Amino acid sequence: MPSKTSSRFANINPNVFVSTIMIIAIFLAIVILAPDAFELLTQQLKNWITESFSWFYVLSVAFFLIVLGYIACSSSGKIKLGPDHSQPDYSNSSWFAMLFTAGMGIGLMFFGIAEPIMHYVSPPSGEPETILAAQQSMRVTFFHWGLHAWGIYAIVALSLSYFAYRHDLPLKIRSSLYPLIGKKIYGPMGDAVDTFATIGTIFGVATTLGFGVTQISSGLNYLFGFEPTSFSKVVLIIIVSAMAALSVGLGLDKGVKRLAELNLVLAVTLLAFVFFTSATVYLLQTTIQNTGQYISNLFEMTFNLYAYQPNGWIGGWTIMYWAWWISWSPFVGMFIARVSRGRTIREFIIGVMLIPTGFTLIWMGFMGNAGLYSILHDGNLSLLNAVQRDSSVALFEFLHSLPFSGVMSLLATVLVVLFFVTSADSGALVVDYLTAKSEDSPVWQRLFWIVVMAGLAIILLLAGGLTALQSATIMSALPFTFIMLLICWGLIKALRIDSTKMQAIQEARTTPRAIQNPRSWQQRLGLIMHYPHSKVEVDAYIKKHVQRAFESLEREFKRRHLTVAISETDDGLQLKVDHHDEINFIYHVVSRETMPPSFMLEQEHNADVEKYFQAEVFLREGGQNYDVMDWTEEDLIQDIIDQYERHLYFLSVMRAQTGN
């Protein structure tokens, strides 16, 4: 009998889990023993990467956008992230709220006011502190927070959700490489990829926690006069982590989802307040103009490396942003994938790319232009000086110039805290997925990673290693960019196969045979109007008649030297024909609940008749939307052969295309 200790750790992937802990321990030891030398080394490496590989980042991010646009417009856009019959797990509003808060919600709070003013003071080109500099600052801010950022997230999220929900692979980064390395994803190579993604996620969240408490401290200092100290920042990290632990303990639906929805409501409230209490017409006009300039200059900005006027601006801003989004993409991409099951690929790309980007542009447009208006028209030099001195106070200094500044500063502080909580709890869920063998892990594993990230942030905060950690996180983006390019290759390859299968099946489509054996018309009518109210009746049919049909086919397939497996599932019976290196054939009969037709309700006048059950056919790609209940064994065998013939046609098309 296994011990309680062994069962408690049974769901841990030891290779990824232990490797992650060891790397974190080594990193902490270096930072604590030689903090100055390590910070200097990481800073120099970061500078070398941004100077030498800026062209590579620019081309890669542009390529990600092109790939997403191609997939969305192609026939692959109709493919679902899951079986063909699957439906979205979350409503559109809940889905968008979770995308927004996990992706960059906290960044908008930090940079919404500060970044446009920083570009206004120090633009990439031209004279600073002019009207042209103000226009350029908004255009650049839109560029950094717009389509490119969400394109990076979308590539990782799309690949993960496609392979996890469409092909039943683990929801892990390694699964994205399956078309390229096959079953090696389950070996050391896959463990290495997941370990790398885990380290990047932990470092990214820990950096956010460490630097984020600075903005929370600024809000508390403004509201209550609390002077920020190392002790107060440690206490804040502990409080935020405790709230994240509570959210994680409640789970994705009750905790993370509810918190994300609350965040979105409060963020919209703050944005509406700024819009109506600032220069409303000015904000509308400038935001619309900024959006037009952003769209019209999108291609130029995408490939602009400032090669003819070299300066450190692009490395300190655009390349830093691209590297930061890439380093966060395993974390955000996995979380987006986790909540996107059941959507079509086209719906997914449009949703992930356009909806959060639209909200981000509105937020940056209203907040950034409100800050610039305060400086340009109201002469608010204190805001300008505050941003130059400490960008974390920008939001609170701006709110000070508006009515009800105390109340709104309190709301802003609460929002910052909640955004940090959602980043921490989402990060813990993602790290838990990466280091566990399955998604059904105990709560203590998620809580453990909350403690690890909080402890890492506290130690580095006290030891002065947060800047080094931030540099290390950005540096990790370079090798992961190569992995993302491989992910694109594997995704396109898999989608091509899926699209070919859809086309081949369409070309070889046969109508379900239904009832072929001779029967009187009265018998046929009675059978097609038979709506079983009991699941037991359908289960009994599957266990008896479907089982016999499967066994008859099994004997014939084996006589022809094919490997066949019949297996019971939670909801039915499955027949699988093994084709070795090619895609296997699956015919699955499922006992499925469905709504009765309206005429049935009218005829029976029975309040209890709210549902009936059917024996629906599922193939590898999902439900086929026809019922085989009451078919004879011969009918079933003929239908299976029809479906198998379509599958063989698809395999022949694939062999012709690949030359095998």
UniProtKB/Swiss-Prot annotation:
Residues 1-13, 74-93, 161-195, 252-263, 338-347, 423-446, 493-660 are cytoplasmic. It is a multi-pass membrane protein. Uptake is activated by NaCl, KCl or mannose gradients across the cell membrane. Inhibited by the protonophore 3,3',4',5-tetrachlorosalicylanilide (TCS). Signal peptide: none annotated. Its main location: membrane. Keywords: Cell inner membrane, Cell membrane, Membrane, Stress response, Transmembrane, Transmembrane helix, Transport. The keyword NAD does not apply. InterPro entries: BCCT_CS, BCCT_transptr. The keyword Cell membrane applies. Residues 35-52, 115-139, 217-230, 285-316, 369-401, 468-471 are periplasmic. Disruption phenotype: Deletion of the gene completely abolishes glycine betaine transport. GO terms for molecular function: transmembrane transporter activity. The chain crosses the membrane at residues 14-34, 53-73, 94-114, 140-160, 196-216, 231-251, 264-284, 317-337, 348-368, 402-422, 447-467, 472-492. Pfam families: BCCT. It is found in: Cell inner membrane. GO terms for cellular component: plasma membrane. NCBIfam families: bcct, PRK09928.1. Belongs to the BCCT transporter (TC 2.A.15) family. Energy-dependent uptake of glycine betaine in response to high salinity. This is Glycine betaine transporter.
